[in-house]
């Protein structure tokens, strides 16, 4: 299915989406993307509907053809301080701040958002499967976050982040019980806060 713009006009329409909200470890990432009005690509869809190979194929296309794009990151420590919902909004704000110019309309994937500098915004549940700019943002947020978890995995291979990317898989939760938490775990998250102490050999 070919995705569309939210409104067919001349306003600079910016799609925003986050990745990593439900993870036990690692930062939350967000992306903000402004696409040309005539942008189209047959593979473009919600990142969750694409294979890893398709996401990484699309990323350079989005980056090269977008009018502007930005990435925002919020650390696990910040997430623990302000909660994951506010952290997701903050990541989107930081992504928008990275854009080369101010958008005129924000499209937010989801049902809530903290307004940014009085720019009109529209919250759309499932927007990443309906609108091009949100789908593009979902792909950038997902791939950049996956890259960050692969880097973190080099120092903490026991948690299997190269496979689970920080999500609460059975193997990840088992590793937390066995090895304890890392500096990259979200200490206020269920599944981390109730983990057992490390086993002693």
UniProtKB/Swiss-Prot annotation:
Entry EC no(s): 3.1.26.4
Cofactor list: Mn(2+); Mg(2+)
Subcellular location: Cytoplasm
Residues involved in a divalent metal cation binding: 17-18, 109
GO biological process: DNA replication, removal of RNA primer; mismatch repair
Stored PROSITE patterns: RNASE_H_2 (PS51975)
Catalytic activity: Endonucleolytic cleavage to 5'-phosphomonoester
RNase H type-2 domain ranges (all copies): 11-201
One Pfam family hit: RNase_HII
Annotated signal sequence range: none
Entry annotated with the keyword Endoplasmic reticulum: no
Name of the top EC class for this enzyme: hydrolase
Transmembrane regions: none
NCBIfam families attached to this UniProt entry: PRK00015.1-3 (NF000595)
HAMAP family reported in the protein's UniProt record: RNase_HII_B
Protein name: Ribonuclease HII
Record organism: Porphyromonas gingivalis (strain ATCC 33277 / DSM 20709 / CIP 103683 / JCM 12257 / NCTC 11834 / 2561)
Name of the gene: rnhB
